[in-house]
Amino acid sequence: MLRNQIDKIRLLFRKDRESYLCFYRILGFYPHNIQIYEQALLHKSSAVRSEKGRPLNNERLEFLGDAILDAIVGDIVYKRFEGKREGFLTNTRSKIVQRETLNKLAVEIGLDKLIKYSTRSSSHNSYMYGNAFEAFIGAIYLDQGYERCKQFMEQRIINRYIDLDKISRKEVNFKSKLIEWSQKNKMEVSFELIEQFLDHDSNPVFQTEVRIEGLPAGTGTGYSKKESQQNAAQMAIKKVKDQTFMDTVNEAKSQHSKPSEVETESVEPELTESETMEPDTLETEAPEAETTADKVETTVNEVEATETEKE
């Protein structure tokens, strides 16, 4: 409380107080370093650069915010649902931090109106709001620390916009989402049961691996094949947002398309070989052509000899 009063007094002497007030309405407290929050709202298409000429965007803050958000929501869910299994806690957390939910939360608190991006860029996508929300969480963490960041999530986000009991019961079909993504992007996705074992209570446990274009994209365990597939698909959905992984997938996909070219090239030597046999055929026929010519010449000589005798 005292800190906010001091910040209010300082704010009176700042030229950029409107920006501070804007963030205060979202956060419930005044930022210490407002530049971090402004950078959290810079999409990579904005083409903003630092004084040294380096591009400024929210991608690094997004990376940090993703990890912090997982930790905070995991903390909240763990304490809210005592006695629940790890699979239940993981699924509940995933429903909160999935991109669709974060997109909606960004709009709810007004971040969508503050994001700076280029309208001419094709990189503008449906995940931009959710990515900015993660970057915003990263900014809070750097500016205020973990506890203040957790307080923001509990008081300003979850208590206002998320019903934990309701969302924990909501079924999300991650496998269907992954298959839909694969069809849209023309990627080959497969699910493989790689292990089956018993837990300490002798309950059967299944482990499934998801492969995208033959590359491992996620593994999941569960007390049924369906549950293990869902958990594996959930991990894969997160994995496909990693650009480095997707570069590897696209390279693998391009390699898979090359065998047809190799097969086409392998036919050419056979055609060439058959073509090289034609001179042999001509050489074989050549003696026959010469024999016929000899016969004609012999016949002509005989006719001339006969005419000479008559004379």
Curated annotation (Swiss-Prot):
Which cellular compartments is it found in? Cytoplasm
The answer to whether keyword Transcription applies is no
A single Pfam family it belongs to is dsrm
Which InterPro entries has this protein been placed in? dsRBD_dom (IPR014720), RNase_III (IPR011907), RNase_III_dom (IPR000999), RNase_III_sf (IPR036389)
Under PROSITE patterns, the record lists: DS_RBD (PS50137), RNASE_3_1 (PS00517), RNASE_3_2 (PS50142)
Needs which cofactor?
Mg(2+)
SUPFAM superfamilies found in the cross-reference section: dsRNA-binding domain-like, RNase III domain-like
Q: Give TM segment ranges.
A: none
State the name under which the record lists this protein: Ribonuclease 3
Q: What is this protein's gene name?
A: rnc
Function of the molecule: Digests double-stranded RNA. Involved in the processing of primary rRNA transcript to yield the immediate precursors to the large and small rRNAs (23S and 16S). Processes some mRNAs, and tRNAs when they are encoded in the rRNA operon. Processes pre-crRNA and tracrRNA of type II CRISPR loci if present in the organism.
Query: DRBM domain: from which residue to which, for each copy?
Result: 173-242
Ranges for domain RNase III: 20-145
Quick one: which residues bind Mg(2+)?
62, 131, 134
Annotated region (Disordered), positions in chain: 250-311
> GO molecular function, one example?
double-stranded RNA binding
Q: Which family does it belong to?
A: Belongs to the ribonuclease III family.
First-tier enzyme category under EC:
hydrolase
Fetch the NCBIfam families from UniProt. RNaseIII
- What is one process in the GO biological process aspect for this record? rRNA processing
- Report keywords, A-Z: Cytoplasm, Endonuclease, Hydrolase, Magnesium, Metal-binding, mRNA processing, Nuclease, RNA-binding, rRNA processing, rRNA-binding, tRNA processing
Compositionally skewed regions (Acidic residues) per UniProt: 262-288
EC assignment:
3.1.26.3
Catalyzed reactions: Endonucleolytic cleavage to 5'-phosphomonoester
Q: Name the active site residues.
A: 66, 134
Q: How does it assemble?
A: Homodimer.
